[in-house]
Every structure is written in structure tokens, then in C-alpha cells.
Amino acid sequence: MISAPDGRIIFEHEREDLAKMVKLIMERDDTNIAGGNFSFKVTDDDGKDYIIMTPTMMSQAYMGELSPEQILVVEPHTRRIVAGEGKLTREINLHEGVYDANPNIRAVLHSHAINNMFWATSGLPEPNVTEATQKLHEIETLEYEPNCSEPLAELVSEHITDIGDRALMHMYLLNSHGVLITVGKKDKVMDGLSAIHQALAIVDTSEWNAQIAYKQAVFQKLGLLDGFYSEGSKIGTLDDLKEGKAIFNPNAGIGKSDKSKKRSVIV
């Protein structure tokens, strides 16, 4: 049963929050006017899950200015819109595929982030060099499948299944398309709103990483660097990148001084 105070809309706080998030993502160039789509899971009073999701054309038609009433409440698999004004995006198949592949995932954020899309169109893995993004480990570009297609949804679902618990804090690059971020927790039902906020942090910090990794690649060609560097360590080279090797810092959070004996916490 979905309950709400008299005169109020169901899941009002969650839908209001997601509407604000859409505007912020647009303002920070974490997506373009083609938009992308964002969702997270909520549970009603009887323990039934629903998907809180942005409507189609949220950016092109409404330029990211959405009201809470325009955020959709969707019944999984039937795709019935329980509440909300607007139509369901065709990429609901992508979101459902992720949630089905790993039920611990509570949020999916798909956007067309400008700097990450540079790496996504290259077909190369994105070197992961900044401290804030090390929790993502490898940033892989998947094989190309057309947007909104069932083959794309199936491809992503297969990869989510293959990486297991790593999918609970992960980002894929969708070839020539954008990013796909998944967030959740193992052995604990993560609050969906917290999960989508974590996904927001990931898309924003990864944008900085994408730009910095690009500049480090340029510096290598100029002879100013001999590799990709992260937290004071060389973690890969242009040759590694060309070969499609994952470039990230396996020793992230460990300082270089004698005083640093413990792994620091990455937030």
C-alpha cells in the first residue's frame, strides 16, 4: 500500500529531490539536452518495490525544469505508471535489466556527461587517476549497441551479473552514448535516495577525472610525463591504454610517508 498525507502526492519527498537533481545535473554539464535518465527504488508500506524515475524528454522538452509531479512512480516489469505526469522512457529496459541482474542495486544513473563521453566514444577504458574516483576501480567502455535497444540492455545486464558486488559502486561507459552508474549495498537494503545521491557524486567527480586523464595523456605525448599518475604512483602508460588495459590505482588510499601506515578512507 502506498500512503500519503491528505492532499499530498505519493513519495513526495523522493520525487521532489529527484526533480532538483535533474536541474543540478543539467547545470553542471553532467548531461546534455538529450538528457539521459535517472532512477532509484523505493519500498511501500507493504514491502513492495517501485521505481522512482525521470520521464522521457525531461531535458529536450522541459530543459531540466521538472516539478515533483512530473517524476514518475513505476511498477517494475509491468511498467505501469502509478503516479506522475509524462511518459516512460524507452530506456526503462536498461534500468530494469540492471535491477534484475543485481537486486542489491538501488539506483541507476544514465547521463551524457561531456568529458566521460570523450572516453566512451574512443572505445578505450578511461584511466582512473583521481583520489575521489578510485572506489570505481576500472572504468570500462562497453561494446557499442544502439541506445534504447534490447541488445544494449542485455549487454549491460550481463556485465552487471559478471562483476557481482563490484556493481554496487560502479560506472560503465556506454560506447558513443554516455555513462551508466549503479549504486547499492550488499546484505543491506540501501535507501534509494541515498543511492541516487551517491550516483550523482560519482558522475560529477568522474567528469573531473575524465578531463584530468585526458590531460595526462596529452602530457605523455608532449614528453612531460612518462605515464598516468595517481596519488604519487605511476599506474599505467599510453601503451597500456592502447592495449585496453584497466588503469587505476590498486594501492589507493595508502600514503607515501613513513607516518602513513594505514589505508585512508576514500569518500
Protein language model regions, located:
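Glycine-rich flexible loops
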Residues: M1-V267
